[in-house]
């Protein structure tokens, strides 16, 4: 159990310091991964950016994920095979437009950095299905990084197995046998507002702005 994202991030940062990271960058999955990524980037003196991904929901139940979409990749579950291709194509198009707008809003239009040859640390506040992280890694691979290191406080067993298979290194503080949801393992699992993401990202990249009253 973690007190909050900040406590988990400090522990992760200590684990990451033992690695030989060359020309590194921290890529956080918004929104919950950003407070964690911000602290790790600060502790390791690395830049911080975002990797954008969003679940693809089932038409009969949008909360039920049938895949994950990034700006340039798509990972589908087996349930998606029974759905019309036209539905999937239309939804993917809408999702990509949405996450592109969100990225520009979060970064204030700043161009995304090159990842070629870099050691990329991908962070989130936890893994439930692992689909979002899996899709993020597949997308990041296309930018030819030197390595991809996944760092998360907690993961389900299934998600850990899925992500380990595609990451170069997998650092996870807890992989409990009984897992109902990521929030189960935090005393404080408050929602991370958009304006906090914007503030943390700007501050991490040496463009100081207010955190709007929020504390890590």
Task: Locate each region found by the language model.
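PRPP-associated nucleotide enzymes
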Residues: 1-216
């Amino acid at each position: 159990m973690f007190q909050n994202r900040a406590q988990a991030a400090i522990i992760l940062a200590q684990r990451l310091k033992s690695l030989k990271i060359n020309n590194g960058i921290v890529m956080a999955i918004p929104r919950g991964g950003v407070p964690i990524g911000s602290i790790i980037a600060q502790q390791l003196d690395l830049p911080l950016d975002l990797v954008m991904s969003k679940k693809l929901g089932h038409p009969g139940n949008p909360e039920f994920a049938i895949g994950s979409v990034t700006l340039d990749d798509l990972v589908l579950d087996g349930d998606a095979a029974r759905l019309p291709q036209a539905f999937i194509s239309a939804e993917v198009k809408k999702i990509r437009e949405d996450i592109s707008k969100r990225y520009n809003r979060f970064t204030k239009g700043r161009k995304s950095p090159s990842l070629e040859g870099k050691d990329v640390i991908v962070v989130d506040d936890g893994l439930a299905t692992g689909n979002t992280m899996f899709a993020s890694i597949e997308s990041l691979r296309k930018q030819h990084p030197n390595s991809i290191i996944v760092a998360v406080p907690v993961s389900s067993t299934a998600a850990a197995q899925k992500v380990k298979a595609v990451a170069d290194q997998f650092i996870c503080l807890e992989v409990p046998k009984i897992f109902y949801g990521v929030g189960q393992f935090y005393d404080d699992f408050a929602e991370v507002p958009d304006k906090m993401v914007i503030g943390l990202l700007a501050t991490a990249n040496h463009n100081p702005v207010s955190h709007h009253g929020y504390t890590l």
